Amino acid sequence: MQDQRINLLAKNLVNYSCKLKKGEKILIEAKGVDYMLVNAIVKEVYKVGAYPFVEMFDNRVTRELLMGETEELAKLRAKFDGARMKEMDAYIGIRGGNNAVENSDVPEENLQIDSEFYSHPVHHELRVKHTK
């Protein structure tokens, strides 16, 4: 049986924080967390007649991707994820993880490339400025 606080949180995120309306599209990104909150959010999105798009990440896989990050790859990822983000009306990001130092051995140069050529254009320029 699911903790009812998860359902209440999902309801508040969708209806209060995002003020999601019928026909709107929302991207739900979850990194390093269990599926229960994501499922509860999806149910609430459907209740208002909106469209959920979900992507779940495992921090260990993200680490491996970052180990090989290049400017070219970051720009390609930004191109594809940016196109998706442009279509969204709202966004919910859920972050967690068991290992706070998961990326500690990723070269600093790779992290900078990811930040400059992926995170900044997709999240700071598109998501923050154009979604709820």
Q: Where do the protein language model's features map onto the residues?
A:
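Active-site bordering "gate/hinge" segments
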Residues: 1-132
